[in-house]
C-alpha cells in the first residue's frame, strides 16, 4: 500500500514539473517571438519599398483651383533611416568652413 502511495506521489510530482516546464517554455517563447518580430521589422526597414518598408500615401493637396490635377509622387516610410543633409549654402552651420579669419 505504501508503494502505491509513493508511486502516485511520484506521478503527481512529474505531472506538476511537466506543467511548470510547459508554462515557462510558453512564456519564454512569446517574448522570443516578439523579439524576432522587432528584428524582422528592422531588417525590412532597410529594403526599398516594393520589397520592404511601409508604404505611405501622401495626403491630398488642397489647391485653389479644383480643376487643376497634379501628379503626386509616391512615398514610403522607412523607420530609423538617416536624413541626408548636405553642406549649408547660407553660411549658417554646415560641415565645411569656407572663411577663416586671421587675428
Curated annotation (Swiss-Prot):
Biased composition (Low complexity): 84-103
Signal peptide per UniProt: 1-25
Recorded GO CC terms: apoplast; plasma membrane
Segments carrying motif SCOOP motif: 82-96
Coiled coil start-end: none
Residue pairs linked by disulfide bridges in the UniProt entry: none
Swiss-Prot/TrEMBL keywords: Apoplast, Cell membrane, Cleavage on pair of basic residues, Membrane, Secreted, Signal
Localization, UniProt: Cell membrane; Secreted, Extracellular space, Apoplast
Superkingdom of this protein's organism: Eukaryota
Listed GO MF terms: LRR domain binding; receptor serine/threonine kinase binding
Compositionally biased region (Basic and acidic residues): 62-75
Major site of localization recorded for this protein: membrane
Function: Brassicaceae-specific phytocytokine (plant endogenous peptide released into the apoplast) perceived by MIK2 in a BAK1/SERK3 and SERK4 coreceptors-dependent manner, that modulates various physiological and antimicrobial processes including growth prevention and reactive oxygen species (ROS) response regulation.
Protein's name in the database: Serine rich endogenous peptide 9
Annotated organism of origin: Arabidopsis thaliana
Lineage of origin: Eukaryota, Viridiplantae, Streptophyta, Embryophyta, Tracheophyta
Amino acid at each position: 500500500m505504501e508503494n502505491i502511495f509513493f508511486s502516485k506521489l511520484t506521478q503527481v510530482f512529474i505531472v506538476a514539473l511537466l506543467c511548470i516546464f510547459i508554462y515557462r517554455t510558453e512564456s519564454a517563447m512569446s517574448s522570443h517571438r516578439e523579439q524576432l518580430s522587432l528584428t524582422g521589422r528592422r531588417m525590412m526597414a532597410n529594403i526599398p519599398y516594393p520589397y520592404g518598408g511601409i508604404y505611405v500615401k501622401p495626403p491630398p493637396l488642397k489647391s485653389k483651383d479644383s480643376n487643376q490635377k497634379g501628379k503626386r509622387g509616391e512615398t514610403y516610410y522607412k523607420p530609423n533611416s538617416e536624413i541626408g543633409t548636405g553642406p549649408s549654402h547660407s553660411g549658417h552651420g554646415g560641415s565645411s568652413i569656407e572663411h577663416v579669419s586671421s587675428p
